Curated annotation (Swiss-Prot):
Binds 1 FAD per monomer. Belongs to the NADPH--cytochrome P450 reductase family. In the N-terminal section; belongs to the flavodoxin family. It comes from Musca domestica. FMN binds at residues 83-88, 135-138, 170-179, 205. It is a single-pass membrane protein. This is NADPH--cytochrome P450 reductase. Residues 276-515 form the FAD-binding FR-type domain.
Length: 671
């Protein structure tokens, strides 16, 4: 009975008894409940069919017990990974796969999708082992997917007696907090009573992290065998993790065409937008900043209106690029493949949470264009598998040798692969007898990762726009080939003058922040595109001044090669100087015979530097090259603090560390 009909009956029969009224109320409530229940039943299929099972490595909340999975499948090895770019996840997969050789059936697990308190139950599984492959990210932080685990292990006081573990860290020595996360987790697990089975391994991405991992791994397994009393090991057998399923009859609307997780997410956009659900932002400006010199630097403006994404000056924007179509076609021809074949790669381990290496079903063309790093330098395990597809024994031995841990093999890999910047396409072009099936290539190559850029605008001025400042990466290799940066080449082609163009993006929050009090003075060091976040800072300080706020000194040290060629945003910066918002210090390294860099200017301005960071307790920022510039600037600061602040070197170093803890010293650097 409808609510409208109930109202009619009541008006016509005003003398109903109490019982009649009570019955009517019951009927009304019942009808409402039935109506709402029916609607929920009708809506349920819409939700379940429009949101596809995620195809990245995740476990649903009802399947987050890794202990149950280990016990149910007779496994004793679990390898957790904390990964931002995919390398730690790749290493974890390789360790779990190799466990079979040593009679340890393993599984890979994402700590973000697991109940990590179950580590306490590992002791209930005989001869069990937990391995942690953990990257350090940003300013000594855990990766996004390891954050909760890191906080839990830091703040918790659990008893992990009976847990056997090992840790391998991924870091970069050019950064101050080298492998901080892995070092801490290794130490903390021992403090909580766990047993270290093998020594901490540390990989350096600035050198050869692949070599570091292999060297550690090849000593790790013998120690594991000794610890658990495992005698001997099986032969090394190359096994496929995924099986091929060609699907010519799949309906076109069920095929992934570049979506990160949810099918049709690019056509049917809905917030919140993040790494698994990027927003398609329109490119509204794409202009050249360099006025000469042969290099290219782009100023790009993206429209994020309607996305509900918010950003602050200093945040990063991540962009999902696509691979060069020419390279994709080349790879298809080298593998003698029909790139438009629809297929799925299905994990042979039915208990794994990672059902596919990337969204499936899809086509080879889409996989190679949107999902796989075809321009990356292949790691040694890929060469080992490629060797099996060589018809020429010399080629097979050559690849196997480069994949080995012998000094000769390592040297060949360094020279022929790394120093020559050979990617998978180049390898197959140069080794004519190597013709692997395209599906195995898709299994071996790592996932194409988003590229991160410092946002070069302030949301105070541009709440619905995000600005990017990026140099086009392009260089000639020793083999005579021209390698191009995946993301910057992709952006270079996005010209809004030829029609609407969009790119998939999301915002990543940062700790790189202006002082909360505008009157605090700041010093910024940003040569080249290191200027990017400071452009946003300066815009914001100007905005505050225009609004009547008191704003402290805003000092920028900027450097480039030549004033008339690559002095980016020159007119803007000079305008800020004219109106009193900015003090600008410039170094043009090639405009005179003797090169001048920003580090020279900072040394010359020792009194000013000390006044701002020592006497006025101002903030100091660095953005740019981590390997040389950032290290040099930090060393100069130590000297300035020693001489002007009357400190010894140790005290000066501690002063900078104190500034870091107070968020007065911040670095946004890359190598």
């Amino acid at each position: 009975m409808s609510a409208e009909h109930v109202e009619e009956v009541v008006s016509e029969e005003p003398f109903l008894g109490t019982l009649d009224i009570a019955l009517l109320v019951v009927l009304l409530v019942g009808a409402t409940w039935y109506f709402m229940r029916s609607r929920k039943k009708e809506e349920a299929p819409i939700r379940s069919y429009s949101i596809q099972p995620t195809t990245v490595s995740t476990v649903s909340t009802t399947e987050n017990s890794f202990i149950k999975k280990l016990k149910a499948s007779g496994r004793s090895l679990v390898v957790f990974y904390g990964s931002q770019t995919g390398t730690a996840e790749e290493f974890a997969g390789r360790l779990a796969k190799e466990g079979l050789r040593y009679r340890m059936k393993g599984m890979v697990a994402d700590p973000e999708e697991c109940d990590m308190e179950e580590l306490l139950q590992m002791k209930d599984i005989p001869n069990s082992l937990a391995v942690f492959c953990l990257a350090t990210y940003g300013e000594g932080d855990p990766t996004d997917n390891a954050m909760e685990f890191y906080e839990w292990i830091t703040n918790g006081e659990v008893d992990l007696t009976g847990l056997n573990y090992a840790v391998f860290g991924l870091g970069n020595k050019t950064y101050e907090h080298y492998n901080k996360v892995a070092i801490y987790v290794d130490k903390r697990l021992e403090e909580l009573g766990a047993t270290r089975v093998f020594e901490l391994g540390l990989g350096d991405d600035d050198a050869n992290i692949e070599d570091d991992f292999i060297t550690w791994k090849d000593r790790f397994w013998p120690s594991v065998c000794d610890f658990f009393g495992i005698e001997g090991s099986g032969e090394e057998v190359l096994m496929r993790q995924f099986r091929l399923l060609e699907q010519p009859d799949v309906q076109p609307d069920r095929i992934y065409t570049g979506e990160i997780a949810r099918l049709h997410s690019m056509q049917n956009q809905r917030p919140p937008f993040d790494a698994k659900n990027p927003f398609l932002a329109s490119v509204i400006v794409n202009r050249e900043l360099h006025k000469g010199g042969g290099r290219s630097c782009m100023h790009i403006e993206l429209d994020i209106d309607g996305s509900k994404m918010r950003y602050d000056a200093g945040d990063h924007i991540a962009m999902y690029p696509i691979n060069d179509k020419i390279l994709v076609e080349k790879l298809g021809k080298l593998c003698d493949a029909n790139l438009d074949t629809v297929f799925s790669l299905i994990n042979t381990d039915t208990d794994s949470s990672k059902k596919h290496p990337f969204p499936c079903p899809t086509t080879y063309r889409t996989a190679l264009t949107h999902y796989l790093e075809i321009t990356a330098i292949p790691r040694t395990h890929i060469l080992k598998e490629l060797a099996e597809y060589c018809s020429d024994e010399k080629d097979k031995e050559f690849l196997r040798n480069m994949a080995s841990i012998t000094p000769e093999g390592k040297e060949k890999y360094q020279n022929w692969i790394q120093n020559s910047s050979r990617n998978i396409v180049h390898i197959l072009e140069d080794i004519k007898s190597c013709r692997p099936p395209i599906d195995h290539i898709c299994e071996l190559l790592p996932r194409l990762q988003p590229r991160y850029y410092s946002i070069s605008s302030s949301s105070k001025l541009y709440p619905t726009n995000v600005h990017i400042t990026a140099v086009l990466v392009q260089y000639e290799t020793p083999t005579g080939r021209v390698n191009k940066g995946v993301a910057t080449s992709y952006m270079k082609e996005k010209n809004p003058s030829v029609g609407e163009v969009k790119v998939p993006v999301f915002i990543r929050k940062s700790q790189f922040r202006l002082p909360t009090k505008s009157e605090i003075p700041i010093i910024m060091v940003g040569p080249g595109t290191g200027l990017a976040p400071f452009r946003g800072f300066i815009q914001e300080r100007q905005f505050l001044r225009d609004g009547g706020k008191v704003v402290g000194d805003t000092i920028l040290y900027f450097g480039c090669r030549k004033k008339d060629e690559d002095f980016i945003y020159r007119e803007e910066l000079e305008q800020y100087v004219q109106n009193g918002t900015l003090t600008l210090k410039t170094a043009f390294s090639r405009d005179q015979q003797e090169k001048i860099y920003v580090t020279h200017l900072i040394e010359q301005d020792a009194d000013l530097i000390w006044k701002v960071i020592g006497e006025q307790k101002g903030h100091f920022y660095i953005c740019g090259d981590a390997k040389n510039m950032a290290v040099d600037v930090r060393n100069i600061l130590v000297k300035i603090l020693s001489t002007k602040g009357n400190m010894n070197e140790s005290d000066a170093v501690q002063y900078i560390k104190k500034m870091e803890a107070q968020k007065r010293y911040s670095a946004d650097v890359w190598s």
